[in-house]
Amino acid sequence: FASPFMVGINERWGTWFAYRVAVLADTDFEPTRPVPGESPCTACRPRPCVSACPGKAIESDEFNLANCVRYRLRADSACQTTCMARLACPVRAEHRYDDEQIRHAYAISLRFIEQYQTGKT
C-alpha cells in the first residue's frame, strides 16, 4: 500500500521497511499475488503525516512531488535528511530506523534529486 507521502506502508512494519530488488526473468513462475487487506492509512485519523509535512506536499488527499522536492532542496529544509511526515506516522513506529540510517538514506535521495535538477545524472 502507499502512504499519503508515497512511501510503502503495511500493518506489520508501518513505513519502516525497504524494497530491495526487482527481478525480471523469462520464466514460468507465477507472480506473487498482492497481500490482501487494507492500508493502515485508511482508518488513521487525524492523519498526523499530513500536518507534519512542512513542504505542503500532502494536500487534498494527493501527494505533490514538486512541493516535496522544492522544499527538500531549500537550504533551511527540515527534510533534507529525513521526512517529517514519515516520522509523524504512528503506524508501527517501534520499527523506525535509527537516526543515522535515516540520514544516510535521505542524504542519498537528496543527492539524486540535486543531480537530476542540474542534469548531472
What residues fall within each predicted segment?
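Catalytic cores of enzyme domains
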Residues: 1-119
